[in-house]
Structure formats: C-alpha cells, structure tokens
Amino acid sequence: MILKNAEIFDENFDLVKADVAVGNGKIERVGQNLEGADMHDFSGCVITPGFVDIHIHGCVGADTCDGTREAVSKMAGHLITEGVTSFCPTTMTVPIAKIKKVLSVIKDCMENPPEGAAVCGANMEGPYISAQRCGAQKADNIRKPDWHEFKDLYEGCGGIIKLVDIAPECDENHEFSEHASRFCKVSIAHTMADYGQAVEAFRHGVTHVTHLFNAMSGLQHRSPGVVGAVFDDSSVSAEVICDGFHINPAVLRIAFHQLGEDRTVIISDSMRAAGMPDGESELGGQKVFVKNSQARLADGTIAGSTANIHQEIKNLISYGVPLRQVIKSATINPAREIGEANKIGSIKVGKQADLVVMDKEWNIVSVFKNGKLNKN
C-alpha cells in the first residue's frame, strides 16, 4: 500500500512532501514518487505518526480500574478513532489487591490485543503519593512508598509497568526511586515537595513528572517548586495536560518553550466521562460532576480530564506552540518515555505503520494501525 501526495513528518520531524509505502504492518519505504499496488491519494493532507497516550484512566464510560478486559477493549476501540494508536491504561490510588487485578487485565490485553489502539503497558498513578496533595485520588488508599511491595507487583504482572508515581518527600532515603528506576520510569506526582526535594529525587532515579503544574508546587520567584526543578534539569521529561482548563494557554506556551521539543509529553489524563455528554460520572471510587466538559469532585477539585490527544494537538497549534514540538510531544516523546521508541512514534523505515492522516485544519481523515485502515 502506498500513501501518496501528502506532507509527512519524516523521521527527523521535518515536514516534507513524501510518499509512504506500507507492507506487513511496517513502514517499508519513504520517498518521492513511490509506485505500487493499492495507492491512496492524500493530496492536501498531513501524515503524522500515530499518537501515544501514556496517561489515560478511561473514556466512553470505561475505566482502567473497572478491572475488566471489556473496559480496556472499549477504550482501545474508541482511542483509535481519535488517532491514538498506542496507550498505557493508568491506575488510580485504589487498594493493592485491585491494582494487582487491573495489572493482570492489562497484561492479558497486551498478550491478546483487542481491536483498536495497542496496549503498551501500565501506568501506576498511586498509591505512593501525598495525602495532602491527592487531588481526585482517594486519600484512604494512599500508601507509603514501599520498594518491596512494588517489586512484588512488578514481577507479579510480568514487568508490564512502564511508569510509577511517587511523592518524593515520602520516599525515605530515596530507597523506592533508586530501586524502582532500574525497572521503569519513576515520576513525581501529587506531591508537597519543594524545589530542593525535587532536585534530590532527580539525583536518585526520578526522570519524569506527572501532569506538570497540577498537584505540585508551582514556580515562584523565591520558591521555584517542583515546576522550577523540572525547568532546571534537562534530563527530566514532563507530562502536560493541554485542554486549556488544567493549565492556562499562556502558561502552556511558556512551559513548552522552556522545556524544549524533546522533554514535553502530551497526555489526556482522561477519565470515563471523556467522549460522553456532561453529567455525573465516577473516578477512583468518587463521584465526579462534568459540566461544560470540565470534570470536578463535589468539593470543586479538578478530577481528571475529558480531553483527548487529538483535541490537545489542535489546542496547542491554536495557542502558537511550534508545530514540530506539538507533534513530537504526542508521538516520539511519549514513546521514548515508555521504552517503545524503537517500534513506534516516528515515520521511519522498519517501524510499525501507525499513522494519522489529517487535513490542513488538523481534522482526522484516516488512521492506520499496523498498516491497516481503521474502519471507524
């Protein structure tokens, strides 16, 4: 199959006019004037790598913590329609027994893939966070970071955990981060840490920060906070929710400028209300109320998002964030964070043919997963 006459983001993320040849689920050739059977004319369109969402709790009424294959399958089937070709189902701060069950379901979905977006591993948001900055996480289920407990979880699920969150001020002698970082990404999240504590965490294995600005200390001129520590350390990547609600658009522009094009990771952080009408929903065992697509707990606390990666890409472009950085932040950067950049995340010969075709207004025209056109 040949995808012809479009502009593409090549393996260096330069926007060029080129054709893409796909076969056996892989990208076989990229170049000018390619010929072959089954040609698709995408004149006037732009082709990007498939989007990668490494932090998503749920959508269309399903949630990772439902702990069922049906829930993850429903998520996968919906996400592909929004251009997401790979994702990490993300747990909440729920009891350890529930986390074990959810991890087993995610493992099954990796080994026996449902239709739609591919499940690339699990993201553990909690339970090793701060009760003082828990946000929409249920405080009753918060636990002190326990390396041995996490090791049992990791080995018990066959090593599918790609990210695990901690509040570093709760990690005594940095034992958890030093050990866990040998197996997966360790990320700061839901924390009361100050600048100095974040810097120390980065020295002991933490290389990632969850939903930058949200549920952490912000940047002030006399108190740089976790945000300042991230800006200050080029080895740390940061997730960013780009719905324009969690973070003001001007602050998004500043953050993307400061972090540069290789450290920003667009996430949805969406919950089961995403893709659904406004109304009452649920997240991590707590009631959520969605009004004007904004999700909050009864006390007004922001409770996840109802956004999706494609929508956030369009937002960032409209905010004036450089196009190249926007696309990298939705594709190769998240793929790199979960150790999948050798397979997905860029349009490069030999990689999976996960591709999104958009028109010049950035509306999705077609989505290809492993070279197959999504029929939805």
Predicted regions and their residues:
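Histidine-rich, glycine-flanked metal-binding segment
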Residues: 1-48
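C-terminal cap of metal-dependent C-N hydrolases
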Residues: 6, 336, 346-376
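Divalent metal-coordination and catalytic microenvironments
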Residues: 6, 20, 25, 44, ...
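Alpha-helical scaffold segments that flank or form the walls of functional sites
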Residues: 45-46, 54, 64-117, 141-156, ...
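Divalent metal-dependent hydrolysis catalytic cores, especially in the metallo-beta-lactamase
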Residues: 57, 73-102, 117-130, 157-171, ...
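Active-site gating loops and adjacent loop-to-helix segments of metal-dependent hydrolytic enzymes
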Residues: 77-88, 130-158, 202-212, 223-237, ...
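Active-site core of metal-dependent hydrolases
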Residues: 151, 155-276
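His/Asp/Glu-enriched, well-ordered alpha-helical/loop segment
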Residues: 225-238, 244, 256-268, 274-358
